[in-house]
């Protein structure tokens, strides 16, 4: 316990605005296991028939412009990492060259889905990399890089496959993380049960948070250039609210009622009648009823004796009544930050298991983004006595999956790195 803490110097500043597409954005991932690969891959006629059928059922996997025609222009050299595996090349009639990769093969030929399925599932639950290395071989950096490579994909584009299913109501918050011996902030954006934005920044002021949440704005606008969410639920941190207003001026910010309750509960934990009355106010069905219940609640607690910190928290709840009532103007919005809090809790456990973040800003952020994709696509725990309707949070959001295997589904959804491209 007396050992001196050692932290290496790392770059904590976010890089400037990126204009180009990331690595892997020119690679199309096709739903295909090894058996179908051996049967179809070397047969040009069979491959073209397969692609034509796939274009009809899943056009979002391909760049716009492919409907005007394409040619299969041969194979790439055989992989040295995976003997017997060769990628194919596809050339569009109107220009543009893409690589075809079967979904059972990982990017960079780093392995196959069957090899890394269970290890990645363990990593998504925060199992330390040294444990995974001991059980499945390779080394710690191999498994860390697998997760980081997933983080290069568009988090929004990979998770949301249909622009019509982009959530209109979001929840956002910052998680305080230990980062190279100092404090860092992971800006999280959640919607429809999925993590749609994760960005790492060194400060939580207006400029840093606008830049961090701006990653979500850029990725979602790649899917739908006109997209503007209706609401976002945040806590009372002004920099968070200012950042979202700066990114989406027409957005309505909903103040989290849960945070107001927690400030009171933390100061007086055993007064269950007080707690019940607060939630009775929250459960009001209309804005008028909410205002009436809030006034009645204030009249009740003003006639009682409270400790100074409790009374101060109650006054703050009353002073924010108009911000809380805004939620009634937007049916379907998140009135509490419960959605993002649940996902933050999972992130907290992963970071705790790894004792925080230890890399540069870019690599640490990619690791968080890769973990978020694993979280969105990993299978739900089985229920006792009844099968689940959906395989994963992403399946529930899209009402569609490309493959019965969760990691195949993630690989295919990350076709062209999750970006929509036109030629």
Where are the predicted features?
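C-terminal domain-tail junction helix/linker
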Residues: 31, 37, 42, 311-314, ...
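Residues immediately flanking
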Residues: 174, 236, 260, 377
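Long C-terminal interaction/binding lobes of large macromolecular proteins
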Residues: 24-47, 212, 217-219, 250, ...
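Short, conserved DNA-binding cores of transcription-related domains
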Residues: 2-106, 354, 365, 369
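RNase H-like nuclease fold core
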Residues: 145-232, 238, 242-243, 250
């Amino acid at each position: 316990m007396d050992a001196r803490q050692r932290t290496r110097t790392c770059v904590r500043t976010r890089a400037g605005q990126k204009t180009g597409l990331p690595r892997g954005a020119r690679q199309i991932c096709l739903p295909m296991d090894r058996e179908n690969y051996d049967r179809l891959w070397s047969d040009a006629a069979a491959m073209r028939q397969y692609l034509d059928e796939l274009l009809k059922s899943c056009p979002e996997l391909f760049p716009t412009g492919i409907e005007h025609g394409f040619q299969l222009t041969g194979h790439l050299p055989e992989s040295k990492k995976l003997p017997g595996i060769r990628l194919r090349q596809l050339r569009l009639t109107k220009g543009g060259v893409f690589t075809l990769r079967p979904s059972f093969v990982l990017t960079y030929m780093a392995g196959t889905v069957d090899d890394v399925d269970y290890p990645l599932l363990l990593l998504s639950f925060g199992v330390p990399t040294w444990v995974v290395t001991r059980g499945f071989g390779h080394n710690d950096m191999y498994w860390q890089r697998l997760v980081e490579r997933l983080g290069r994909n568009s988090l929004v584009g990979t998770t949301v496959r249909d622009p019509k299913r982009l959530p209109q109501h979001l929840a956002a918050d910052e998680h305080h993380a230990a980062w190279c011996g100092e404090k860092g902030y992971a800006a999280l954006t959640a919607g429809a049960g999925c993590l749609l934005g994760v960005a790492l920044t060194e400060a939580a002021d207006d400029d840093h948070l606008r830049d961090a949440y701006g990653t979500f704005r850029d990725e979602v606008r790649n899917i739908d250039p006109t997209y503007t969410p209706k609401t976002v639920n945040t806590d009372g941190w002004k920099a968070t609210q200012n950042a979202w207003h700066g990114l989406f001026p027409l957005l309505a910010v909903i103040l989290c009622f849960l945070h107001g309750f927690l400030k009171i509960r933390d100061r007086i934990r055993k007064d269950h009648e007080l707690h019940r009355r607060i939630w009775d106010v929250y459960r009001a069905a209309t804005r008028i009823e909410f205002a009436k219940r809030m006034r009645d609640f204030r009249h009740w607690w003003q006639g009682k004796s409270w400790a100074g910190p409790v009374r101060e928290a109650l006054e703050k709840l009353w002073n924010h009544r108009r911000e809380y009532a805004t939620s009634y103007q937007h049916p379907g919005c998140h009135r509490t930050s419960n959605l993002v809090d649940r996902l933050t809790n999972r992130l907290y456990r992963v970071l705790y298991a790894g004792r925080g973040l230890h890399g540069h800003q870019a690599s640490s952020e990619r690791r968080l983004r890769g973990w978020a994709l694993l979280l969105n696509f990993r299978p739900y725990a089985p229920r006792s006595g009844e099968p689940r309707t959906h395989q994963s949070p992403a399946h529930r959001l899209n009402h569609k999956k490309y493959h019965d295997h969760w990691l195949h589904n993630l690989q295919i959804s990350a076709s062209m790195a999750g970006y929509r491209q036109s030629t």
